[in-house]
Amino acid sequence: MIKKTLATVIMFFSLALSSTVMAAGLHDDMEALGKNYKAFNQAKNPQAATTALNNMRNAATHSKQYKLAVNTTDKVPTSTALFDQIIVEIDKAKVLVQAGKLDEAKKQGKKIAELRDQGHKYYTH
């Protein structure tokens, strides 16, 4: 009986710890996305914009490993699909930056914020 109880307690704490680590990892990725989105919009030169976009892409790519719970009954894209869309928009903005079109890239970057807002609307975080 003691072994069963001990095993149950250990399993519970392992599950709780893994959930906490996952939430912290996702939270860190979301903070990195937000911080670098702001840096991208404030960038005065292509190098700063490219660095911010690269950091955003890394955070979005890393975030794909987390499967988020939908908080609506509406049919919505998976969290992985939303992160894929964000990555596509980041790549489009990066192409514009590399072509010397920083202002146009910032306009393109607004779609990233729209996707972020959509994700926050549909997913628990």
What is the role of each PLM region?
Residues 1-9:
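Bacterial N-terminal signal peptides that target proteins for export
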Residues 8-11, 21:
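Cleavable N-terminal signal peptides
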Residues 30, 53, 60, 83, ...:
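Generic L/I/V-rich hydrophobic alpha-helical segments across diverse proteins
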Residues 32-62:
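N-terminal targeting signals for Sec/Tat export/insertion, comprising classic cleavable signal peptides
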Residues 50-56, 76-84, 105-113:
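Short, charged, amphipathic alpha-helical segments
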Residues 87-125:
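Surface-exposed, polar helix/loop patches in the mature regions of secreted/periplasmic/lumenal proteins
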